[in-house]
């Protein structure tokens, strides 16, 4: 392992006043690193109080531009950007000075990486994470910041708190978790697991995955749309809000739906015993077959209604 050479010298902006920047941004230094890496190498990036943005490109090198900033010149200079690389990996970290754990400081990174590089550990706090056009797995984490990931050919694991999670065009499984933030997922080809609290989950899947889809929230609504008949099991659970499931007309499944202090309605005929047609459309429990039956769909809420709608809208 060797420490990467700084390609461009740090540009000091100390002493300048910026009307639109908070105290932690007052003193800044920019940095720029470039080095070669194998196409399937590994990327680790860690920061705090700042964003991380990563885009894949068709070059066998990594390019990093960024800015470190602080409320005083001394804190800015004490904040270190630690970068190491080999042909197989790149690691970059923003490191607080050991004597200062609470001062106003942080760093943001913008990175271009080989398209098939694995994003092994991308983490920040109080800032967003954005990933685009990567052809391998991505493990992303933030706190008090949103995560936005688009066009990834590999499994995605995205965790944050007090921020939203957006995932679009994922050619693999996606695990999306937050608290007090909404989750929106589109076009996930593998297993989808989404979990939040006090906010909504919306998922639109053009092609229903063969793996399980699991959506769990509390005090938030769930809206799931499938563009094709379900192939894998589906579980959606919330409290104090509604669930909407949009299915194509040719859907076939085993439906189990439960609510308390709400109602269940279905555009589909659900074959079950012991109820009249009207009772099957509006009730608090439904257990039966849609069409010839198939994967199990479990929908559960309290203090909210459940609606199974015909027509995907995709």
Give the location of each predicted region:
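Intrinsically disordered, low-complexity terminal regions
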Residues: 1-314
């Amino acid at each position: 392992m060797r420490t990467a050479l700084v390609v461009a010298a740090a540009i000091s902006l100390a002493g300048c006043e910026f009307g639109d920047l908070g105290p932690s941004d007052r003193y800044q230094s920019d940095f720029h690193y470039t080095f070669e890496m194998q196409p399937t190498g590994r990327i680790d990036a860690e920061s705090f109080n700042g964003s991380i943005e990563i885009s894949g490109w068709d070059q066998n090198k990594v390019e990093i531009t960024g800015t470190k900033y602080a409320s005083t010149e001394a804190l800015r200079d004490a904040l270190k950007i630690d970068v190491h690389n080999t042909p197989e990996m790149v690691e970059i970290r923003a490191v607080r000075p050991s004597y200062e754990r609470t001062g106003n400081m942080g760093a943001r990174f913008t990175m271009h990486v080989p398209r098939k590089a694995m994003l092994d550990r991308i983490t920040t706090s109080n800032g967003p994470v954005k990933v685009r056009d990567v052809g391998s797995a991505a493990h992303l984490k933030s706190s008090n910041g949103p995560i936005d990931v688009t066009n990834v050919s590999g499994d995605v694991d995205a965790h944050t708190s007090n921020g939203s999670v957006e995932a679009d065009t994922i050619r693999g499984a996606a695990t999306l978790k937050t608290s007090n933030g909404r989750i929106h997922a589109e076009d996930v080809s593998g297993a989808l697991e989404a979990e939040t609290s006090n906010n909504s989950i919306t998922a639109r899947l053009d092609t229903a995955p063969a793996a399980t889809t699991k959506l769990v929230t509390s005090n938030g609504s769930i809206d799931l749309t499938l563009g094709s008949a379900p192939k894998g099991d589906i579980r959606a659970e919330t409290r104090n809000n509604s669930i909407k499931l949009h299915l194509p007309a040719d859907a076939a499944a085993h439906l189990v739906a439960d609510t308390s202090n709400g109602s269940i309605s279905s555009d589909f005929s659900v074959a079950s015993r012991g109820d009249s047609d009207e009772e099957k459309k509006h009730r608090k429990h439904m257990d039966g077959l849609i069409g010839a039956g198939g994967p199990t769909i479990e929908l559960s809420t309290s203090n909210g209604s459940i609606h199974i709608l015909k027509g995907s809208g995709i």
